[in-house]
């Protein structure tokens, strides 16, 4: 699929989610992927749903006064969690390419009275952020959606300060998917067909200039979560995939949390 077409369909898919709040991560699932009940208690209502695959904030070792940049910030959940840690002396910037998500995040920001959070409309391949801005970059199940992941990591490197940290959660492949799944629009929006092999993902981060790159956590999604997810059901219906075969695909996918440093 062409890069422009991919971005268009992802933007449209996530715009629909922003309007309906119909995402895969119910409160029960959010806790399964790393968000605690205590954390969720302190975010605005409407931000407490996630399209992610982990909690990058939990592993980012944020410090008071730091500037955090979230790539693909959605409704703002991770931004608000980060803001609670860095405090009023810190700053959090969320970037998302979907206008409806930016509107949703800004609304949530107003509801939560956050003075240290801002949301910017833009693409993660061309961040509307100055060089050497962030102490920490986080991202949650977004980079797999980009058709130009190499460029994303180069932009992350550019916008980080020297010594800045990268802490991202994302979906990677442990084995190649069938061509029919790779070409599926629903599978792309569902963070599946855009994913690359784990070794390739790490290689792209290192190629951008990051050092000390390591996978700090690797998990499989619960099979019942994948098979019963509304997006997964749409993929199964589109490609006429029975539940048993879908479970085999689930074994090809992992959620990883990756750490790196800008030297």
Specify the residue positions occupied by each region the protein language model found:
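C-terminal lobe and adjacent flexible extensions of AdoMet/dcAdoMet transferase-like proteins
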Residues: 208-263
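Short alpha-helix
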Residues: 193-209
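A short acidic, Gly/Pro-enriched loop at the edge of an enzyme's catalytic core
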Residues: 64, 125-136
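Conserved SAM-binding strand-loop segment of SAM-dependent methyltransferases
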Residues: 112-125
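A short glycine-rich, Lys/Arg-flanked "PGG" loop and its adjoining helix->strand segment in the class I
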Residues: 87, 150-165
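Conserved SAM/SAH-binding beta-strand->alpha-helix loop
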Residues: 98-100
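Conserved alpha-helix/loop element of class I SAM-dependent methyltransferases that forms part
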Residues: 29-67, 71, 78-85
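Short, glycine-/aromatic-enriched active-site segment of Class I SAM-dependent methyltransferases
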Residues: 172-192
């Amino acid at each position: 699929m062409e890069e422009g077409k991919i971005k268009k369909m992802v933007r449209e898919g996530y715009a629909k989610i922003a309007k309906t709040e119909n995402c895969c991560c119910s409160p029960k699932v959010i806790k399964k992927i790393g968000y605690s009940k205590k954390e969720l208690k302190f975010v605005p209502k409407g931000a407490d749903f996630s399209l992610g695959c982990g909690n990058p904030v939990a592993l980012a070792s944020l410090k008071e006064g730091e500037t955090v940049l979230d790539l693909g910030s959605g409704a703002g959940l991770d931004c608000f969690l980060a803001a609670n840690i860095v405090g009023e002396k810190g700053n959090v910037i969320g970037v998302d390419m979907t206008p409806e998500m930016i509107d949703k995040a800004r609304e949530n920001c107003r509801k939560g009275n956050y003075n240290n959070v801002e949301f910017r409309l833009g693409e993660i391949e061309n961040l509307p952020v100055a060089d050497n801005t962030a102490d920490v970059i986080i991202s949650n199940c977004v980079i797999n959606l980009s058709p130009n992941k190499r460029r994303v990591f180069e932009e992350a490197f550019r916008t980080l300060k020297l010594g800045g940290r990268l802490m991202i959660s994302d979906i990677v492949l442990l084995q190649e998917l069938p061509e029919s799944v790779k070409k599926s629009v629903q599978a792309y929006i569902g963070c599946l067909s855009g994913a690359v092999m784990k070794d390739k993902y790490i290689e792209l981060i290192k190629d951008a200039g990051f050092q000390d790159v390591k996978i700090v956590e690797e998990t499989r999604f619960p099979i019942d979560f994948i098979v019963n997810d509304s997006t997964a059901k749409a993929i199964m219906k589109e490609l006429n995939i029975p539940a048993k075969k879908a479970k085999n695909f689930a074994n090809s996918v992992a959620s990883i949390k990756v750490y790196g440093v800008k030297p």
